[in-house]
Every structure is written in C-alpha cells, then in structure tokens.
C-alpha cells in the first residue's frame, strides 16, 4: 500500500474512534452493533494498524453511530 492510502486508513480509524467516543460507546458496544469482534474494532481504530474495511461494514458503522456515511470521510486533521 502506498503512503497516502495508509494515511487515509489511519485517519478513517481515528474518525470512527472520534464519533464512537462522542456517542458514548465503547469499542465492544460498537463492535457488537456491527457484528465484528472487539479486537477487530480495536484494529480498525488503531492509528498504526491500517486495517481495511468493506463498504458494507462502513455503512454498518455509520448507521450504528447515527451519522451519515460521508461523515466518516470528513477526516479530523
């Protein structure tokens, strides 16, 4: 993967973590809501993990966080 892609995955994970915390959810609660393990959720949010996601899973995460999907791509820089 190139640097730009890795950086986008890092920012996506940090954005998911930001909105999860803003909603008052734990990683375990969000993971359960989107049918993945807490470890997988932790890997998604970890700034140095670079775990990729399917569009379907991103849609599930946005729905669970009650935010528009596009919000996940408005990276907090």
Specify the residue positions occupied by each region the protein language model found.
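Residues within the helices of the helix-turn-helix
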Residues: 17, 28, 59
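Short, basic-rich loop-to-helix N-cap that marks the start of a DNA-contacting helix
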Residues: 48-63
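Recognition helix of helix-turn-helix/homeodomain-like DNA-binding domains
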Residues: 35-51
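Conserved hydrophobic/aromatic packing and binding residues within compact polymer-binding modules
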Residues: 16, 30-31, 41-44, 72
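A short, Lys/Arg-rich alpha-helix, primarily the initiator
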Residues: 1-22
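Short C-terminal boundary/hinge segments that cap the last helix of small helical domains
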Residues: 66-77
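Alpha-helical residues within the helix-turn-helix
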Residues: 21, 32, 63
